[in-house]
Structures are given as structure tokens and as C-alpha cells.
């Protein structure tokens, strides 16, 4: 699943939840306000109709290949400010933009590494990294029908990564400002006296 993350120190979020839930709530609100324009722009990049007729009308020669649905792709582009898993350095996602749907992920990233190797529909095995289409050129033709990938600081893509690139750092700057503001306010509260654990 394609993801754009803003990472921060997990101890800050834990401390806010325990001692200053009002600041935690404000941080989540500010992060959402920073990221919502990127989400809206990314949804706008999903074409109303499939880039090729075969993708919408049938499963592109493979029963498990997801069909194109603009509404599904748009609803699958979401934002969350719930902290994610902590990495070995003590950081977790402070904010995350997801491209959750299978069709959305395909539209977003297809062609990053070129077309999948073709093995044909009669090949054995269950590998997901190969093309089992009856057409050996299906992968290349599929990619040719899609818009070019857009490079961003978070990766290449056609939806969330394109929106992130066109945002030109505004969302990231606003998110970092929100985190810095809450951190300073929390530190000021600590300096003013002992904090009580939230009920």
C-alpha cells in the first residue's frame, strides 16, 4: 500500500495523551488541516473513467486483477494522525496519507520498476510478481496507457505522491510547525509545575 508518512518522536505523543490530552487533540486537528489539501488533490488525480477499456470492463485477463473504480480509489485515499509502529530509533508516524485500494495502488505505482516478467496463464506456481496474461506485452501496454510517474520527496507516483510533489512542502511545513508549537506549549506546562495524569 503506497504511504506518505511524517515521522516524529513517539515519546511526545505518549506524554501528550497521558498529561495533556487537550494538546494531543489540538495536534491531531492541526495535522489534519495540514494534510487534507494533499488528500483532496490526490483524489482529484484519479480519472473518472479507466485509462483503458479493458481495466474497467473485465479483470484484464486475470481473475484476481482488481477492476478500475474511481470512487473506490478516491475513498481509499485517506489521512490518519494515529501514531504508527515505533521504529528502532524511537520514531513513529505522526501523520500518514494512505492509498489503500488495490486499484489505487496499481494506478499509483505501476511502472516504477518496469512491466512484470511475463509467464503466461498456464505457468505453474503462485508468484504475485509476474504477469499471467495471455498477452506477453500486456504489462508494457498497461503502463503506456497511464500518465507519467511524478517524482516527490517521498517517492514516485500518480496520486498521493504527485499531490505531495505539487504541494511543494506546504503540508510538511504546516505539520512540522504544528508539532513544534505543541512541543513548546507542552514544555512550558512542564516548566510551570508538575503535571497530573489525565483521567
PLM regions and their residue ranges:
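Short, Lys/Arg-rich flexible segments
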Residues: 1-94, 99-104, 113-116, 120-199
Amino acid at each position: 500500500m503506497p504511504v506518505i508518512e511524517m515521522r516524529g518522536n513517539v515519546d511526545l505523543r505518549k506524554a501528550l495523551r497521558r498529561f495533556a490530552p487537550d494538546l494531543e487533540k489540538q495536534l491531531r486537528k492541526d495535522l489534519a488541516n495540514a494534510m487534507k489539501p494533499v488528500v483532496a488533490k490526490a483524489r482529484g488525480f484519479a480519472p473518472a473513467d479507466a485509462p483503458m477499456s479493458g481495466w474497467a470492463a473485465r479483470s484484464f485477463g486475470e481473475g484476481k486483477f482488481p477492476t478500475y473504480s474511481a470512487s473506490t480509489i478516491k475513498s481509499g485515499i485517506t489521512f490518519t494522525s494515529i501514531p504508527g509502529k515505533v521504529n528502532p530509533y524511537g520514531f513513529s508516524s505522526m501523520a500518514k496519507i494512505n492509498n489503500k485500494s488495490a486499484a489505487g495502488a496499481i494506478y499509483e505505482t505501476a511502472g516504477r520498476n518496469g512491466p512484470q516478467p511475463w509467464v503466461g496463464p498456464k505457468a505453474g506456481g503462485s508468484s504475485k510478481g509476474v504477469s499471467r496474461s495471455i498477452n506477453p506485452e500486456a504489462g508494457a501496454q498497461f503502463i503506456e496507457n497511464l500518465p507519467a510517474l511524478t517524482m516527490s520527496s517521498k517517492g514516485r507516483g500518480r496520486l498521493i505522491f504527485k499531490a505531495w510533489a505539487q504541494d511543494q512542502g506546504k503540508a510538511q511545513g504546516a505539520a512540522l510547525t504544528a508539532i513544534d508549537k505543541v512541543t513548546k506549549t507542552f514544555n512550558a506546562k512542564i516548566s510551570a509545575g508538575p503535571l497530573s495524569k489525565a483521567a
